[in-house]
């Protein structure tokens, strides 16, 4: 990063800290993968946090990252409006980070989004950020994409000035995507099957998504009522990503790209325990997961996207055969 870019980031951080100091922000689902990063950014900016989720004990690890009295924890479930009303009462801003990869998509991603937006509007919250996903579309054939789209519509109806962010696949030390494939490649399996090898992704660093969310809260005049699609600097295919991970951890498995006919058949068995993919996930894979042309992006929120290869090798070392002592081929 250039000296000018570093100075720009430092200035932006100082401005955010001045704006957010002592503001109360409710994070619905704040103990999750993205939530912890949003919490860390807000705590660093001097904000007060209310972490709301079904079991708040799952977010207690954030206690060690905050000052005395800076963070409170409450039980809340997006399917129960009365608990959300209590969670957002008195908040200056609310971030809804709740999503579902299985279970009742409609109740969580559509109904839950509506409950959060309606409660925030009634409570007089100044800023609401709703975390959706690239591919959200009320007409999507997948339940995940369809309910994400329905959730966005519900948020817009209840809280028109809300900011909606749609990340692509997020990566980070605790992610369930890059780590999942790295573990598979590092396993004794002699062959790694790849479904939809030509599908395109635009992986985005979770820390960048968190920074964008905080920027949207801190500057509502710039972000209110807008939808942002958040992707990283590189677009990669599924096949290329798997090969990159293999190089990064110094492994050389046989990587087999399965034809769609076989992938589709496998997805029909997705209801079985341990199945590699569900039917709904297969439907999602039929559409590239990249930022749409002309969409507002990270840059519009003052965030420079972080390349995967600048941060991932630091945690992928755990999957190398001999850890840090393994010699690897450059993962470029």
Residue positions per predicted region:
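Mid/C-terminal beta-alpha module of Rossmann-like enzyme folds, strongest
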Residues: 15-19, 216-278, 291-332
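N-terminal Rossmann NAD(P)H-binding glycine-rich loop of SDR-like oxidoreductase domains
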Residues: 23-47
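SDR active-site strand-loop-helix element
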Residues: 28, 52, 97-98, 128-134, ...
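Residues forming the Rossmann-fold NAD(P)(H) cofactor-binding site
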Residues: 36, 110, 149
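Conserved glycine-rich Rossmann-like NAD(P)H-binding loop of the short-chain dehydrogenase/reductase
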Residues: 47-57
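NAD(P)H-binding glycine-rich loop region in Rossmannoid oxidoreductase-like domains
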Residues: 56-115, 119-122, 134-138
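Conserved beta-loop-beta element that borders a ligand/cofactor-binding pocket
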Residues: 132, 152-180
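A conserved pocket-lining segment of Rossmann-fold NAD(P)-dependent short-chain dehydrogenase/reductase
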Residues: 183-208, 212-216, 220-229
